[in-house]
Amino acid sequence: ILSPGISLNKNKNLQKYKKKIITDLDLFYLDRKKFKSIVVTGTNGKSTTCKLLDHVLKKNKFKCLMGGNIGKPLLSLNKVNNSFVIIEASSFQLSHSKFIHPNYAILLNITNDHLDWHVNMKNYINSKFKIFENQDKNQFAIVNRNFKYLFKRKKLTGKLKVPNLKQYVKLKPKLKNNYLKLNMNDENLSFVYELTKLLKIRK
């Protein structure tokens, strides 16, 4: 199991073992329990989005766990059947993952970052897109509207959903939390809103 801090792009000695290397995310998904997963990645906004999703799901009586880069380490979570697991996934974790297949894969945004680890932007983008690679036709890929064009070049099996920011903004006045009303939260909340529609949550 490879530590997320180690980059194969910079370690030639490990590259020959690339096919055998797995990550904590892979091990988590090899568990046979029937849980549903929501994986959130992006350069910015991951933690905020995960916390909001956790709050909304629990408020609506869903069994819910949260881990990864937020909350508890993934492998310490006690998964139960029919529970939701919210995972904050970094590009480091995703880069070498092979078996991850989220029911709901969320890509918030991508900006220039972590290039010291990934070496170039292409590697960074490819690591983020790992969350979509193993999805099936019954799973959902929820993607920032600015990255729709990338899917013309990449095969996507999951159902593509693009949050409607304008639709969310119309609902914004109903928010009671003044912090969440700040414009910087609009993007994150539009993704939360999109997922609540898929889960048929109305509160």
Say what each PLM segment does.
Residues 4-141, 145, 149-156:
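Phosphate-binding loop of NTP-binding sites
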Residues 118-125, 129, 155-203:
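Adenine nucleotide phosphate-binding catalytic loops in nucleotide-utilizing enzymes
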